[in-house]
């Protein structure tokens, strides 16, 4: 939709009092969330349906969004978990052979409030310099209730994020003629993680976030994967306790994103909130062992403090080339390694997809 199109007004109010005036698309109303930005050029439908964005208002830095539409095949979860959506310009005439609708209709169906025709470059600079902050998108006159909204914004906090996105039921995927059985913890996992494991000959048992060591023993998997997910990792105290016990079962473990953070917390390390996070499909990561840099897809606002890990327990295997933060951990006395980025990257770079070929079974560690 042209940025000059005259449609219903919408407003973005930030915690620092900054107001952006734009136009409404998607649902109408008022929504509060943590305002973040992603630098991905494509994959907006995957962004909108990634549970890791729970409670957040997502800004797309790329200026034109929606030109290939939306379709049923690119969902990363059953629904959208973002609180709100911000773009510079959206396309109302998408063209793609897989297209089944446009992004405005998608947002309306998902009841997501969006705003377009604002200066997303200016907004991104504010977040980059001041850090992520809470904000509100509203289709009402923001100036008439600015003080009331600012109070609500400052009181807003994302809580119980993992509990809000995990499925309480255990589900099984993959063929009966599988080579391995993998227990995938659902902290807010993306479907493509599951699909990549199935494509590699695994039967995938998706288990709830609060699954215990005893329950894992009953499943008897060849490997365990801790998935991505939303929120502050340190608030998941019961999950962290379970992970500590699960790690002692001797079953190979691989963690991604939030799973990487929870595994580190379970083994004595700490996490920190990043100023504006790593969100996008162009994050450079250095593999310390190889001395090579890989381009990765990421979506996280917290990071493991690498130096907080006891060197007798684990060592940092990957670091972010931009800010030097921990991007991977390899454990010494347990059969486990974890990464902060997404090797499955759908859509995004496939530089680190080889990590998914590492066998979940100790019988064949070179696959």
Residue ranges of model-derived segments:
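Catalytic beta-strand/loop cores that center a nucleophilic Ser/Cys/Thr
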Residues: 292-334
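RNA-binding accessory domains that recognize and position tRNA/RNA substrates
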Residues: 2-181, 185-202, 206-210, 214, ...
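A glycine-centered loop/beta-turn motif at secondary-structure junctions
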Residues: 326-359
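Active-site-proximal beta-strand elements of phosphoester/diester hydrolases
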Residues: 181-186, 296-297, 337-341
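Single conserved hydrophobic/aromatic residue that forms the stacking wall/gate
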Residues: 357-367
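Cysteine-nucleophile active-site neighborhood
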Residues: 218, 223, 227-303, 348-356
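Proline-centered loop/turn at the N-terminus of a beta-strand
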Residues: 113, 181, 252-254, 270, ...
């Amino acid at each position: 939709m042209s940025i000059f199109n005259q449609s219903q007004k919408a407003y973005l109010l930030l915690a620092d009092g900054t107001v952006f005036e734009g136009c409404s698309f998607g649902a109408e109303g008022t929504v509060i969330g943590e305002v973040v930005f992603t630098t991905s050029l494509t994959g907006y439908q995957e962004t909108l349906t990634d549970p890791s964005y729970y409670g957040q208002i997502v800004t797309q830095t790329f200026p034109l969004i929606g030109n290939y539409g939306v379709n049923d095949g690119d969902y990363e979860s059953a629904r959208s978990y973002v609180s709100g959506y911000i773009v510079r310009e959206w396309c109302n005439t998408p063209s793609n052979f897989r297209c089944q609708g446009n992004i405005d209709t998608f947002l309306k169906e998902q009841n997501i409030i969006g705003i377009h025709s604002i200066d997303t470059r200016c907004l991104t600079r504010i977040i980059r310099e001041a850090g992520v902050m809470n904000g509100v998108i509203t289709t009402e006159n923001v100036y008439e209730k600015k003080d009331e909204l600012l109070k609500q914004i400052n009181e807003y906090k994302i809580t119980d994020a993992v509990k809000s996105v995990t499925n309480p039921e255990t589900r099984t995927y993959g063929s009966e003629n599988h080579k391995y059985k993998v227990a995938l913890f659902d902290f807010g996992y993306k479907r493509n993680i599951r699909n990549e494991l199935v494509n590699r000959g695994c039967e995938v048992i998706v288990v709830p976030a609060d699954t215990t060591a005893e329950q894992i023993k009953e499943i008897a998997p060849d490997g365990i994967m801790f998935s991505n997910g939303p929120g502050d990792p340190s608030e998941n105290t019961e999950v962290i306790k379970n992970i500590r016990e699960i790690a002692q079962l001797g079953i190979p473990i691989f963690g991604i994103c939030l799973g990487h953070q929870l595994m580190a917390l379970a083994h004595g390390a700490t996490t920190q909130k990043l100023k504006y996070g790593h969100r996008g499909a162009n994050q450079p990561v250095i593999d310390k062992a190889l001395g090579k840099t890989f381009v990765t897809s990421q979506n996280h606002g917290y990071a493991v403090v690498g130096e907080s890990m006891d060197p007798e327990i684990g060592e940092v295997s990957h670091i972010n080339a931009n800010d030097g933060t921990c991007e991977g951990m390899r454990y010494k006395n347990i059969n486990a390694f974890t990464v902060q980025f997404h090797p499955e990257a759908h859509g995004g770079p496939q530089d680190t997809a080889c990590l998914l070929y590492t066998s979940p079974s100790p019988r064949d560690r070179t696959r």
